[in-house]
């Protein structure tokens, strides 16, 4: 929403949202005359700044997205996030938000418009109603990534696994988790489909751009884990879907691209399509050339980051009681802040390198080890790869380390800033 990486302005936790003076795509669209309909959760702005980002806000209008846990705290699967089958006809906030968005389109929306739907699903706990619950044959699913050598992985993962009793979860139970996760994804497809159908029915399809993506993935059984961690970077967490439809007809319609892209690229892509002015320094790259089939490459490396400093008490997530299903991860993070320490990933098509502030680094050969099971970071034969990717990481930090506002400040009262229209070479 800004074209910034988390480190640019310190947005590295769940409790420091964008400030009113910071860039935000939704606010810029609204200022440019777009009617902005917001239906979904808020992981973006401070509450007092929310009204500046929408023209209409759809209230939640439903209960828990996941129903109630079927387990007691002492049960073996209590921390597995597996809630299972919801009652037939169960209505979630996602149903409300997408129904309202579809109705908005059928009613003849103001022009131009932007619909922003940050849905909950398929975020765990893992729960969904029929027909989605039984849609995927548990025995026909692709194999899950095996349990790795956790001594070569960040220790937060083994701490979570032990506290959540995940060693006691069977292969079939992990496959149940994955099948329900797939069902939640398919339900999300159906909910988004209602909005797309309304776009077509209202004659708006050809002149509307559509972006569908996720902010992160989940383990959902891979590596013997269930829920993401914020400073781990396996592809199941970071290689998220991105589906885009441009207005009108494009030669590349229906194509699938393996170009390396980042979520920061969303901002300049929408800004270009909407004709928004450049108001701040940002680090995304417009995807329009790739989307129009003008090029097949976009970036030669992508980055991700997460975690906190040991001494950053104000960034550590709130402690929870044992009855909270997030207790295994949050208690581990609070018991050992360095296990949740800062880390940065750089990924090319061939390699993934993770630099950790307090722990062993990671290096994976994605061509020969796509499941990221063998950490090569300390293998002397790959020292050159580590050095090359470390240099790329340093260049990235130097390039994106801060932003200077476009608007200059006066140094003395009444002193004009001047311009450079009259100058000597």
Over which residues does each language-model region extend?
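Short, charged, surface-exposed hinge/linker loops at domain edges
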Residues: 404-419
